[in-house]
Amino acid sequence: MDLEQEEVILMKLQAENIFFSYGSKKILENCSLTLTPGKLTVITGPNGSGKSTFVHLLGGLLQPGAGEVLLDGKNLKSFSHIERACRIGVLAQEKLPALDFSLSERIMMGRFAHLPRLFEPGPEDKKSVEEVMDFMGISSFGTALCNQLSGGEYQKVLIAALLARKTPIMLLDEPTSALDPAGALRCMEIFRLLKSETAIALVTHDLTLAAAFADELILVNKGRTFAAGTPGEVLTKENIAAVYGCNAEILVSSTGPVAVFR
């Protein structure tokens, strides 16, 4: 199953030595990363380590106190919010209430950055919505309204809305947290499929998914990058013990890696 690209635009997003604080409370210190098409970057770490703030800074939803975020070498602050929305798609962890929109209406909202103000969606927009509904396997939801869906079903609709925008960069904060194991696996397979033409970073607490799908894994702890590299380099027993305070190891079986906590 393919998700047709309207136009392939390859872009690079960089965070260089960024710092961020809420008042006197330091949230992130000296964090850097580079997102490019061809690799899936996964950010993980304990609760409160700054992962969501990192995503908000990368998407331009927050401004760093020091350092900078660069989009193809230009400071992200130099882009208008419409220009950013056409280039960077963000799925935040905080969700708006699921109101009584139809599935297609809610997914069409993901296309708004492409639409001139006060203009109706065109055939290409409607085609994109139909494509992502099939791609995400939610066409079977039928005529259900968003507020009639389960949390996991609605999460699939939100991911579909992000995919419908077809941005060259996607940032997703805990996209699989509300999904059952089969749904989480399917979504990660979709992100892996899209990475060849899309720069993708996502946050997850699931170390098994991180080990199985990450090309680059960033382990954040107390606002700092504790370790970065391949899953094998990052998810060592020593690193997991230091960051999470428990014993765990990544076991590799015939079906893939599994995080085992002891």
Give residue spans per PLM region.
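Catalytic Walker B motif of ABC-type/P-loop ATPase nucleotide-binding domains
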Residues: M170-E174
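The feature captures the beta-strand-to-loop junction immediately N-terminal to the Walker
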Residues: T44-P46
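ABC ATPase nucleotide-binding domains
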Residues: K237, A242-R262
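Conserved ABC transporter NBD signature motif
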Residues: G67-N75, R84
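Helix-to-loop junction immediately C-terminal to a conserved catalytic motif
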Residues: G59
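Conserved ABC ATPase signature
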Residues: F119, L145-L149, E153
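Conserved structural motif at the start of ABC-family nucleotide-binding domains
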Residues: L13, I27-N30
